[in-house]
Amino acid sequence: VTTAALAAELGISEGNLWYHFKTKRHLLESISEEFVRYSNERLALRPSSETDVIEGYIELMMAHERELLLYRFLYRDQADYGGHSQIVLDNITGLYDKSRAQFRAFFTEMVRVGLLDWPEDRIDHLTVNAIILIRFGLEYLRETQQAFDSSAVEQTFLQHLTLFEHQLDPAAAKRLRDAAARLLTDSAARAA
């Protein structure tokens, strides 16, 4: 992500961007504050008795997609700029703790309503693996020099489904896979 691209996204000149932020570090801190705020909003999503758990999980995946697309360079390029900004470092443990609780709540609810056949004592393992695939998928693509295009985020969702879709009710698995495929189709249309 270049400052020229950021300025274009905001509809301002690059010079105006630098007038406001002065340095790349100031710009990174501002983006990081917004990232932490957005992440905390996404982390508020939980299964609800008013919503089908699969619909809730699809909503969670869509929120993750928005987060990864908006802040993809924080995930993908951290090695290039020397690590996270201080606000992310100050919040990272809490963000991971909340992410584990969030995924655990969804997987536990899927088990409770009979959609996921998974041993209770292994839900934490599934939770951590799902987070690892979603969180580090972009970095993996970058480090292995695979194509990184607009469908990369959605591809990470398809990969994370392979962790548990074989233990899902077939109709629920199809709904999740179809939702991920729609994300891929929408992503390809945006890129065209």
For the regions a language model picked out, list residue spans one by one:
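Helix-turn-helix
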Residues: 1-26, 30
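Secondary-structure edge/capping motif, primarily at the C-terminal ends of alpha-helices
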Residues: 46, 50, 75-82, 110, ...
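Short, hydrophobic secondary-structure boundary micro-motifs
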Residues: 76-79, 91, 119, 176
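Hydrophobic alpha-helical connector segments
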Residues: 44-73, 90
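An amphipathic alpha-helix adjacent to DNA-recognition modules
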Residues: 20-47, 58, 62
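Amphipathic alpha-helical packing segments from all-alpha helical-bundle domains
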Residues: 87-113, 124-139, 155-166
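C-terminal peripheral helix-coil segments that are non-catalytic and often amphipathic
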Residues: 139, 143-192
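Helix-loop "lid/cap" segments that line or gate small-molecule binding pockets
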Residues: 62-69, 77-83, 162-167
